[in-house]
Amino acid sequence: MAQENLLIELGTEELPPKSLRQLAESFASNVEAELNKAELSFDSVRWLASPRRLALVIANLSDSQADKIVEKRGPAVNVAFDAEGQATKAAQGWARSNGITVEQAERLITDKGEWLLFKSEVKGLSVAELIPEIAANALAKLPISKPMRWGSSSTQFIRPVHTVTMLFGSRLIQGELLGVASDRIIRGHRFLGEAELIIDHADQYETLLDDSGKVIVDYERRKAIIRDQVEALAAHENGVADIDESLLEEVTSLVEWPVTLVGSFEDKFLDVPSEALIYTMKDNQKYFPVLDKDGKLLPRFIFVSNIVSRDPAQVISGNEKVIRPRLADAEFFFETDKKKTLASRLESLSSVLFQQKLGTLKEKSERIANVAEDIALQIKADTKHAQRAGLLSKTDLMTDMVMEFPDVQGIMGMHYALHDGEEQEVAIALNEQYLPRFAGDKLPTSLVACAVSLADKLDTLVGIFGIGQAPKGAADPFALRRAAIGLLRIITNKNLDLDLVELVEIAKLQYGHKLTNDNVVQDVVDFLFARFRATYQANGYSVELIQSVLVRRPTKPVDFEKRLQAVAKFQTLPEAAPIAAANKRISNILAKVKGEINAQVDPSLLQEPAEIKLSEILGSLESTLRPLFDNLDYESALFELASLNEPVDEFFDNVMVMAEDPAIKANRLAILNRLRNLFLQIADVSVL
């Protein structure tokens, strides 16, 4: 069976840059699934993409499906023929439907009987017959939220499609995709390359676009070129480029032939907090800021052009003219905002709703202040600073700078607070209240900042759950999942001795009678436990391990973490599996008991040496374990409990638990209950 590389390319108008990678990856994934479904053999599916095209190269694709022998079983022989050996209507009808006579049918003999059988050879379809439908199906499944129509066609896609190329080796596959017929024409760069290129063979694709089209169609190669060029230019300016991965991805999706250039701006703008300048460079202009070796902003920026200009200085000047008004705006906002203190802006928060049923941002700030003060007291942070930071936490939202550049909220609060003469710890908390912003982000550095960040997240969680608007499915408009995970990360990583139920109760208290959900405390705590499960599972812990701890519902995250780590290490012991099995057996026995089980073991009722031995060991262990439990030293406790493996085995081998004498039976159940409760003080190892 012959093999060739297959090229599929859609030439489009400019695709949304923030969606380009996802579209290309989804296209490749969908085509791969369709090829497997069609049972076509291939080595790999590689995606390529630029602003004006989506493309795939399928390596070593077979030219057709394999031929198949299809077997169709008919009626059983004893049903197919009557007593005289004549074919019945059932047999005749089956044969007719398969285009044969009964006499032409073969026989299938198994240990269960004998049946009529028809075998036919089905020729595999060719790539030319299959690929148009495969590609169409793959395109139909792309994640496109807002498709558009163009021209007079009813066809919809994310952007208008102008060319389609499906090339199997040198052979053009005829067909249409999105209303456009397959052709050998591909388009070069809009300004630098040839408008139309004729491609003769799939293997020419990248080279042809590189040489004649001035398009680097390999996304990852283009991205690497941009990174290298930006870093080299920054080094030439005695600096380091501030390269965000998300910005690099977006810029890669905006250009087909990257040319990096460096521009500059006046030193006076460096008096403005660098975060505001960096924000406008990155977010508004898609520029890469340049920092010195100490991380301070230099009056330079690097941008990526999509053309090779005969006069680069003109291009640089044009970009400098574009950025200068943005920087001037930031300078103006900064100077204007400093004329009013953050404290003086608190009252203006009364005009901004946090949520219709939950009141204004001023009310939210007051709640945050109260909760932050309470948390600070518990974690031995400065309560006055925590209360003050909580009260001022949202005031920078009313500044011109934050209204213009929303992403600098918090950081501008810090700068304005320092200008106002607020305590440094208060100012830092205003910046760090939003941490962590995303998975893997840094955490607040001070205890005051931790208190404010926790208070803010608790207020949002309790408020939204309290009015019955918990997240449903993927929808999470208030980012409650992120808030919950951030809350748990702060408490766990900072080793804060805080109880979730107590925290939620404190936050609930601040709302007075605003909340309508009577079960809000339980609902929020359950939501937090669910985030425990998801977070630890993502970190590689097994579902069983996490569940063993969740059964105990330890409401202190630090306690939860210590239990989880202890059980994880316990699982590595050779005694772990038999002890888990024994706990499961004990759990099943105790679950069937009707009525209460004695809390104490009566030594006078012990008869068998194995039960005497186990009871004595349990008594000794209880004394040993008590200080370990008090110190949350669950790891040492489980190592001690591992010593029960042998005496428990002896007990089950030599002792009849369900004895005929009710008193002896009850006493033996009490031994098992006592043993089970020792383990349950840490986790339910029976689920391991």
From Swiss-Prot:
Q: Which InterPro entries match?
A: DALR_anticod-bd (IPR008909), Gly-tRNA-synth_bsu (IPR015944), Gly-tRNA-synth_heterodimer (IPR006194)
Q: What class of enzyme is it?
A: ligase
| GO-annotated cellular components | cytosol
Keywords carried by this UniProt record:
Aminoacyl-tRNA synthetase, ATP-binding, Cytoplasm, Ligase, Nucleotide-binding, Protein biosynthesis
Provide the GO biological process annotations. Answer: arginyl-tRNA aminoacylation; glycyl-tRNA aminoacylation
Enumerate the PROSITE patterns for this protein: AA_TRNA_LIGASE_II_GLYAB (PS50861)
Catalytic activity as recorded in UniProt: tRNA(Gly) + glycine + ATP = glycyl-tRNA(Gly) + AMP + diphosphate
EC number(s): the record gives 6.1.1.14
Q: How does it assemble?
A: Tetramer of two alpha and two beta subunits.
Which protein are we looking at?
Glycine--tRNA ligase beta subunit
Gene that specifies this protein? glyS
